[in-house]
């Protein structure tokens, strides 16, 4: 049997780079769940005092082409382009992903729609920032 080398996984490896392809982000999420977890950061206005705004993304889903808006292509990767009942729709490098569940720092895991009811992100004006 031939051995291969794999680097040690660090917590920082889970940072979501929204300019990557949707399929790559979804695979990253599956690979790094439950540890180290895939994460992004909320816009500054949603951060609580003494909180980094780190949000662990625990579930994403692909949208059918019929459910997408061609105008979303003009937005930068990481931009929340729409808010659906199931959660925020975030622009990626080659399309969009629906964030179906996430866990804010110091909080329990929530469905994407429940998260939006507590922190109403505005489409096309708020971004999920990389670190």
Language model features by range: what are they?
Residues 13, 18-131:
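An anion-binding loop in the catalytic cleft
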Residues 1-16:
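Flexible, acidic loop-helix segments that line cofactor/substrate-binding pockets
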């Amino acid at each position: 049997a031939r051995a291969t080398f794999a680097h040690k996984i660090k917590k920082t490896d889970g940072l979501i780079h929204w300019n990557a392809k949707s399929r790559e982000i979804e695979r990253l999420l599956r690979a790094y769940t439950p540890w180290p977890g895939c994460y992004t950061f909320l816009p500054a206005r949603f951060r609580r005092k003494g909180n980094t705004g780190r949000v662990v993304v625990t579930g994403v889903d692909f949208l059918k082409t019929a459910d997408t808006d061609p105008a979303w292509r003009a937005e930068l990767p990481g931009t929340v382009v729409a808010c659906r009942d199931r959660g925020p729709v975030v622009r990626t490098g080659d399309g969009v992903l629906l964030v179906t569940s996430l866990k804010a720092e110091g909080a329990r895991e929530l469905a994407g729609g429940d998260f939006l009811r507590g922190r109403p992100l505005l489409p096309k004006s708020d971004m999920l920032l990389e670190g």
